[in-house]
Amino acid sequence: MDHFAYRSRSLYCENIPVAQLAERYGTPLYIYSKATLVHHLHQIQEAFKEVEPLICYSVKTNGNVALCKVMAEHGSGFDVTSGGELHRALPVSYTHLTLPTIYSV
């Protein structure tokens, strides 16, 4: 499932014209679809539910705190490899998870 689509030669993200977002926030601009992110996380969780996995989001991949918050809200733990990554993941972990789960090697 992808919540990005072209309509009448304009790109939309979750029914919002991307051009409108660029006009409001300027460019370059990173745009994420919360619905797409959550959908894919739930697919992974469902596929492995028999073994009760802890899916951990790699903060190194994208340390955006808003993305970390979405992942925590939907049951994700965090994979961190530095103090900075831990600093971003810990506050959302304590807020949204029953037991904060931070994994680091």
Residues covered by each model-derived region:
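Single conserved hydrophobic/aromatic residue that forms the stacking wall/gate
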Residues: 96-105
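A charged N-terminal "starter" segment
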Residues: 1-97
